From Swiss-Prot:
Residues 499-511 have a biased composition (Basic and acidic residues). InterPro entries: RBBP5/Swd1 (IPR037850), WD40/YVTN_repeat-like_dom_sf (IPR015943), WD40_repeat_CS (IPR019775), WD40_repeat_dom_sf (IPR036322), WD40_rpt (IPR001680). The keyword Heme does not apply. Part of a complex composed of TRO, RBL and WDR5A. Interacts with TRO and WDR5A, but not with WDR5B. This complex is formed during both vegetative and reproductive development. PROSITE patterns: WD_REPEATS_1, WD_REPEATS_2, WD_REPEATS_REGION. Its main location: nucleus. Disruption phenotype: Eearly flowering. Significantly reduced trimethylated 'Lys-4' of histone H3 (H3K4me3) levels at the 5'-ends of WRKY70 and LTP7 genes leading to reduced transcript accumulation. Residues 466-547 are annotated as: Disordered. The lineage of its organism: Eukaryota, Viridiplantae, Streptophyta, Embryophyta, Tracheophyta. This is Protein RBL. It comes from Arabidopsis thaliana. The gene is RBL.
Amino acid sequence: MNAPIIDPLQGDFPEVIEEYLEHGVIKCVAFNHRGSLLAAGCADGGCVIWDFETRGIAKEIRDNDCSAAITSVSWSKYGHRLLVSAADKSLTLWDVSTGEKIARTILQQTPLQARLNPGLSSPSLCLACPLSSAPMIVDFDIDCTTLLPVSVPEMPDVLAPPQRSKCPESNPPFSPAAACFNKCGDLVYIGNSKGEILIVDYKSVRVLALVSASGAAPVKNIVFSRNGQYLLTNSHDRTIRIYENLLPAKNVLKSLEDLGKNIDGLDGIEKMKTVGSKCLTLFREFQDSVTKMHWKAPCFSGDGEWVVGGSACKGEHKIYIWDRAGHLVKILEGPKEALIDLAWHPVHPIIVSVSLAGLVYIWAKDYTENWSAFAPDFKELEENEEYVEREDEFDLIPETEKVKVLDVNEDEEVDIDTVEKDAFSDSDMSVEELRYLPAEPIPDTNDQQDNLVESIKLIEGQISASPASEEAGQNGHHASSPQAEEMGETRGKRKRKPSEKAMELQAEKAKPLKGSGKTVRAKNRAAFDQETDDSINGGDDDDDAYY
């Protein structure tokens, strides 16, 4: 849709269900960095990748060792790798282009969510949030996991050393913690069961700052906006909170260390809270004051202007959209099915939501065209009106009154090689990004080939039993006999229609004749045979053919 003919007063958010995608029972979805590919995890352990431009399946990925439901899918920054977590406690890293498995590891707990490091072009490092364990960093290259802290002890000097092992021991059950990377991938933000947000350096496994939230409710989800300027948390107190990120986009670790050095007279938790207040500040809170419902899979829009959250109530498929100022602007109501996951398109105002039945619904904007943008004097009519033209409206304009054509430099070279950078893209142009997958033809199986051979034999049998074949047999010539080939008759060819003269003679032959019928019948029979021979040998070129 061209931007000039879109009404600028309309909100840039989805409004109606445009289409739905179906492939087994879908459990989770994720867009790649450009939004050209949509990955989905299925209940049978497989993954499917749709080309979102054509809405066709581009690739299917399946691990023979996994038959459990997929819990999350995550793209690498440039789209070459896909991380899949499953209910059988496995993490699998895939090469999207070739469909080959790069690495696979088994955790001690079921990972509810796993995310690849967004700061690496070919990441082999991911952040996993297990069901009953602390968030951990998983390194596929060395097959090692590192548990991250989820709380700050009273005495920071007695911090326990980080637990690094190939098979970390399972900890006592506790409320699961949510975690995510920042935009550059050098810090991890963890929301714990106390409602606190910990800023952790995952390389040294140190807590650098602490942010306390009001209410002290456990944090269920935590996610950054695409530009890294805002942080969203979803808590058990049915409130979505938006924090503004005060740290710079680059050299984040150095900035945090400088903040800690500039604070004197404080130690321990108080110092971390002071540093945290200079890292994040509460910007807005969102909640339904009437129903007090829980929220499912909240996230930002691609440009960060909108906040979206799904209703966690059973039996309803509702999506709430707010602007950053905190105003509820739209409620999208879908089918009577619970919502389990959703994602906002990185570039376009499109939302995809997953229902409990396993369908993927695509929500898009209902555009109203504004054709007056092409001509300022364009007037939209509510109904048909009779137009009376002026007397000189279509008269030829004299040469002296013609508008002078603007001078255009036709010799100037037009740049057709430079690609304009997307407004929301932060990709490095030096690295080739995977935007589309080539179409792969599906080879015929042995069963399909056998069915094709049987179909051909069946058709040949029907042709051999056709009336034309029976007529040829009655005349003493088989359809494939040499005599039939000499006469120009072969199976599958068209048969000549007798001429009008032959038809008339045949009709006269059937009538009873008076007088000496033997002589007349002999003459008619000779003429009819001669005409029939001419027809068979192609004597009548103007006759029509029939099957």
